[in-house]
A protein has these predicted regions:
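Membrane-interface helix/helix-cap signal primarily in integral membrane proteins
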Residues: 54-223
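Alpha-helix capping and helix-coil boundary motifs
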Residues: 42-46, 148, 175, 190, ...
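Short, electropositive, low-hydrophobicity segments enriched in small/polar residues
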Residues: 17, 203, 207, 233, ...
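N-terminal leader/targeting segments
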Residues: 1-74, 161-163, 283, 300
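Generic recognition of cysteine residues
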Residues: 9-12, 37, 124, 174, ...
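Hydrophobic alpha-helical transmembrane segments in multi-pass membrane proteins
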Residues: 5, 47-50, 162, 214-312
Length: 312
């Protein structure tokens, strides 16, 4: 079975998630899995493609249920949890991931946003805290512009919001990225637009003053603060171009066509990590890695083949 065929099966299996009014129950998923396994033993290509598509459909539904589990289960009661801070404004807004709940590890860790209270001591990304939480699911109310906050929160892997009742630090050390950003912020301090520079370059929007955020939103330039796939792809292109230009000064035996490709992907992955590895950046890194592997395989791939594999 060709890799592009598998890619088409993945796309067809995941697509119904966009139009389903509600997720099927466990019994339905069990029946579909059994039915797909039976179809897989029929020696007809088309039937096996249908079986593979059904299996990917079940996998997509299970992944969706896993994302919604936190909002359906953890709300209401007070939860004893261990939270890793992934971003903070240093004051009352903190982004984190619940790594342990009631003493048991959770994987994948659901994300949450804590509002309205200062932590007992200075906070930075990378710290691990023991907290008593009161959380709720993000509401899906639409505003005048048609923006679905719940869909956006789920896409960002942050389905929960709430506050903490008690908090004590377990691991006070900051992550390497947080230490670098603190150093960069100190370097940019003399500049009037230091918060905007940090937001445009590193995607750190929490430190941008509210007045500037309002101006950027009203002028339609707020999206520039988000590190998108375009930024990551441009970083890969720039790095690959510099490496290719530097090969002019190397001996002929040291010049390989793979070097700019691998170097560009590595630089893109590093920049994505430096900007927080947000879902859009992560998806771009994965797509670049798939494209790189296709190129390194030595086969001739059409644009459609590459597009299908990256999309899947």
């Amino acid at each position: 079975m060709k890799i592009t065929t598998v890619g088409v099966c993945i796309i067809c299996g995941i697509f119904p998630l966009l139009i389903l009014p509600q997720l099927p129950g466990t019994v339905t998923l069990a029946f579909l899995t059994l039915f797909a396994c039976v179809l897989a033993f029929i020696p007809v290509k088309t039937v096996r493609y249908i079986a593979l598509t059904l299996l990917f459909f079940v996998w997509g539904i299970l992944a969706a249920k896993q994302i919604l589990w936190a909002g359906e289960t953890l709300t209401g009661a007070t939860q004893d949890a261990i939270v890793e801070i992934i971003a903070t404004d240093g004051m009352t807004t903190h982004y984190g991931q619940i790594t342990h709940l009631q003493g048991r590890r959770i994987f994948p860790a659901p994300g949450l946003v804590l509002y309205g209270e200062y932590l007992p001591q200075a906070v930075c990304a990378g710290q691990v805290w023991s907290m008593k939480l009161k959380v709720r699911a993000v509401h899906g109310q639409l505003n005048d512009g048609g923006f679905d906050s719940q869909r956006y929160a789920i896409a960002q892997h942050q389905p929960l919001t709430g506050r903490f009742l008690q908090a004590s630090v377990i691991e006070p050390n900051c992550s390497l990225r947080a230490q670098y950003l603190a150093s960069l912020q100190t370097t940019l301090q003399p500049y009037m637009w230091n918060a905007v520079i940090l937001g445009l370059g590193m995607g750190e929007r929490l430190s941008v003053p509210k007045e500037i955020k309002n101006i950027m939103r009203d002028t339609g330039t707020a999206h520039l603060m988000a590190i998108s796939g375009l930024h990551i792809a441009f970083a890969a292109l720039l790095a690959a171009g510099l490496i290719r230009g530097g090969q002019v000064f190397l001996p002929g035996c040291w010049i390989h066509w793979q070097m700019p490709l691998i170097g560009g992907i590595c630089c893109a992955a590093f920049y994505a990590w430096l900007t927080g590895m947000q879902p859009p950046a992560l998806r771009t890194v994965v797509a670049l890695a798939i494209w790189g592997m296709l190129k390194l395989s030595g086969r001739q791939w059409s644009g459609w083949d590459v597009w299908i594999c990256c999309l899947a």
